[in-house]
């Protein structure tokens, strides 16, 4: 039975470590599906499964636990960054400043509540321990590490602040998710209406394509060419088909418009009214029943060399005699603007003769199998650069310890940048949704299992004996009070969408489990966008403020 003894109890055995993680993750994910009052904790339950196993002595080497924890977190935040990168900067313009101000409010209130409790207990809880509780309450491990480095600079010899962190962390996770749920019921959030509101907000009228059939009624454009009309009108649109005297053809820049001609126009919703008034009037016409010597087809961009090229630079009309009317990216239709940058994974709607469309398909790739091959190089190049950025010390005057973004903040920032600008470096950033979700889920469960196993050994003893319960209570107040206050302000004053607010709360607390819960509630990317919009600034402030408190008050 030596093999069983080694499998169950030998912390240096690879088989034991894999066995332990497999059990903790499987049990946690399974139990996380159980709903209490209609609410389940999802993968967050992996944390508690890890604490339980750690309490009964099932553990692994500390260095291995820390490696798996950090690697899991890196995978999670990097995949989040890749997913939201294309929309990160635009979301910042459309309300990101408001979200970041609200996140700063949460950080400031967390500190205010922590210092208030420190003075309330009048020395019973030492300041370093309260900082440890603060970081557990906001589930921020890099901040805890930075605080420990500051204490080393101050030659601190007191109790390990990680105990306060361990006591506050579990209820910190529960408190953050609980606050999200509480806000939903306090403000009677209608999830269906929030989804519809989100779709309305995300439908950017400048990019969303609008299709209509128009009849030429303006005598001033009769006899003018398509290019002349475009230049005079000053609006961007695509005329993919024209019906003249009962015959349908594909127009080019030299096609002349005549009174009574019927046109199929694709433009942005923003430009549609002006184009309609200028050309004539909108009519009902079934183009499928006309003598149409052409086909319309969605073609998939799969060739890496197309990645990063603008639609106009491809010269589809002049070289192949086809028109591109719209581009579908990640389920959203975009107007075929000549300046639109094509990316691998885009679906391009092409209208033209059968043989011409086939030639365009060959140019773009249109091979679904290519998209099934993961772009491993981009992922690991991004992680490499992210760790490099996260390890870069940022010195501030008067601060003995340089600040760092850490192993979570660095990869997230780099992933966002790669997701947005990777095409300029000829990096293919497309990843199938299933592959992205798989990597994210693996990352988050490894992170949670590691934290739980590591904290489980001393957790019960710390809670039952000494001031453990006090630490738990303080941490819970630090977690909940700021979230409820800022949540109320966000909903009542700023009218923030509930799903975006979920991401804001998770990101301001740098809490991946809360984001994982939010992603289970909705199929939209709003929580992930909200999370990544506030995460970089929140992470920076979390790391900075703990060190500043200790250096200023000790």
From Swiss-Prot:
Query: Could you tell me which SUPFAM superfamilies the record lists for this protein?
Result: TrkA C-terminal domain-like (SSF116726)
Q: Which family does it belong to?
A: Belongs to the AAE transporter (TC 2.A.81) family.
Entry's transmembrane regions: 13-31, 36-58, 73-92, 99-121, 161-183, 376-395, 405-422, 442-464, 468-490
Q: Which organism is it from?
A: Bacteroides thetaiotaomicron (strain ATCC 29148 / DSM 2079 / JCM 5827 / CCUG 10774 / NCTC 10582 / VPI-5482 / E50)
Which PROSITE patterns does the UniProt entry name for this protein?
Answer: RCK_C
Which PANTHER family does the annotation name?
Answer: K(+)_H(+) ANTIPORTER SUBUNIT KHTT, TRANSPORT PROTEIN YIDE-RELATED
The protein here is known as Uncharacterized transporter BT_2092
Which NCBIfam families did the record assign?
A: PRK03818.1, YidE_YbjL_dupl
Q: Which Gene3D superfamilies has this protein been placed in?
A: Regulator of K+ conductance, C-terminal domain (3.30.70.1450)
Q: Where is the RCK C-terminal domain?
A: 199-281, 282-366
Q: Which UniProt keywords apply?
A: Cell membrane, Membrane, Repeat, Transmembrane, Transmembrane helix, Transport
